[in-house]
Amino acid sequence: MKNMGKSMPPVEVRKMMYEKAVNRCVVAKGDTMKNMKLNRAAVGQVVTYCAIIAAQNLFDLDRDGVERWQAELIRRSEVYTLETNVYGTLKARENLRKRTAPKMKEDFTLPVEKWPRKEWERVQLYECRGAGDLVARFFVEVMDGLGYTTEEIAAALKEIQGNFRQFLEWSKDGEYVAYYKMAQCYEQATGIEAAIDEEPGAKPIFGKEI
């Protein structure tokens, strides 16, 4: 197991910055999208949970290690947020791709339950995959900074995709069933509580976000 260290930088303010960075790709567009099977506003957080669970499963992180990874994810998002503010979203994404592409054997593609047929479904898929790609590239930067190899990064990205497929499978029993099960898996893997908000649409899905 790699030494993740015991120190963690303060994250209270940074949590909001991370959420904003992810949500640049998942901005809500009105009532038409409100009750989708998979809420775009939650995609970035779901993929983040998938990523942390993958890291814990593959690299046997303890709680301090998990918190270190989460703090590093937030720090990477700060760089992206700063570049977005200075250069604009397109340039910031281009810079992120350039930094991460050499460490990725292939692009990260978020799995789908079924291919969209309607235009709004295609738009939703595009934006959901954009959110997933953003989180995955933050994750790649974290792994690279911690000294993991390209092969280990590829294995972790596959694990994230597998975790998201499981989330989609759970969602067949209902969207909130999937969210609860994802939160349970996160708690079991990390020992960190992940509350689920009871009122759909009023708040973020996960009461405690990374």
Language-model features, listed with the residues they occupy:
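Extended non-catalytic scaffold regions that mediate assembly and binding
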Residues: 65, 111-112, 153
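Intrinsic disorder/low-complexity detector
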Residues: 2-55, 79-144, 173-210
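Short amphipathic alpha-helical surface patches that serve as generic macromolecular interface elements
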Residues: 136, 154-157
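Amphipathic alpha-helical segments that form the core helices of the histone-fold
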Residues: 69-80, 156-168
